[in-house]
């Protein structure tokens, strides 16, 4: 179950419900990772509307957030918030999802009048994903006749320490509604897929995985995946390998519901963690069960003079590359 709230310009309502929206289709973007913590951490979102078939466009776009607090468990469900804003074609709008910059209004001297803030998430450390779809002024989806009318990019920024990473929004090539499938997205990690990764010493660097499972009705439903570290050479028991070829075995998995940032330490036992703590190592990230997922590996260091202060790096673990 997902708690949903809607904000149409200045009207806010909060409700708990199951259900779906109108069956009419609309091109929909997925921003799988939105990280906010006003006023220190923000995600700047940019949305391009090139129009639909024959450059027909909707009058508005609806921005639907599914979120939970960073302190929530990986398995907890999400709440929801949404806002409806006018749009034009062609058009570009950029905004700060945390509300730190320009109060969440449009950025970079945008001459268009949107009439309010795009930032409808609560304060505090929040993890979320964002759906953007064509709609009417009430937020009902409309069909523009083209599955690639919208595109977008996002940049996650640590304003306090000065670091950033970014990604492109996802657009299912086969459909226009709030559902996403592996057949329409080339860069998910399918169930059963495994990707090799490395990590720096946890004594200095933090490694975590931002995981957003994808599936049907992502505007109302919490989709889930079970993730783990697969054993060396495909062993059924999990493992991690440190420098010097020492391999540590364990059986640990995490159930991710809606979205979560999973710490590397939560994917192994304490013996393995102690063994690789000062050296780092490598392993196999596995989507073991549930739904396909968008998975980004993030590695960062904060205020460490050895590495020039604060630095981070993130990339997508994708089924379209390998191993």
Language-model features: where?
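Bacterial N-terminal signal peptides
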Residues: 9-19
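Bacterial N-terminal signal peptides that target proteins for export
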Residues: 1-10
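Gly/Pro-rich, tryptophan- and cysteine-flecked surface segments typical
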Residues: 22-323
